[in-house]
Amino acid sequence: IRLANSARFGLARTVGSVDDAITMVGLNQVRTLCLAACMGDAFPDASDIDRDEFWKESMACAGFSHWLARSIGADAQQAWLTGFMLRLGELIIAQQEPDKLAIIEKLPHAPGGRWEREVDQTGFTEGHVVGELVRRWNFPQEVVRALQFSSDPLASKPFSRLGGIVHIAMLLAEIGVESTTSPQDTINALPADVLKQLQLDHEWLQNNLPDVNTFTDTAA
């Protein structure tokens, strides 16, 4: 119900029943949200992670992944779930090596900087970790590869389009949640080589970039 009443759908009236909410949101999105909620409950909160920021970035990454995938004709629901799962890898790192978390979460949070600190401290990124988890859970190989190469999708041979989508989506999420920049500055901060592989045009992105709040207002 909360999702159906969010700014994403822009309804003129308030949705008050589960049936109406499911009709508005769609069964695919409901299934994805249920799975995401279960996965979130499976991992305890870590004291050195800002809980509000963590889940907002997860929802923003999922939302931007869905938007990008739909824009280029990829599987939008698969992209949403892959984008949502990415930061769960950091929670696994927090469980296994809690002493490393304070350094990984060190401020300021420059876009992509957390991946670098994760590698410096553990030898892996959150994407490597959660990619191995979903491999053991028998997720589709496309999702496994996308997560494993999410920090460097160009290293995947052949190129992982889903990995590229999630990479760009996570950068957009970090910029959107943690800073206030114009659409032009936001797009200019993205890696041109990955955008080229995804055949995403700078001008189109600037003109159509969604407000991060359309994704994060359901994250609390």
Identify the role of each PLM range.
Residues I1-K100, E105, H109, G113-N188:
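Conserved alpha-helical "signature site"
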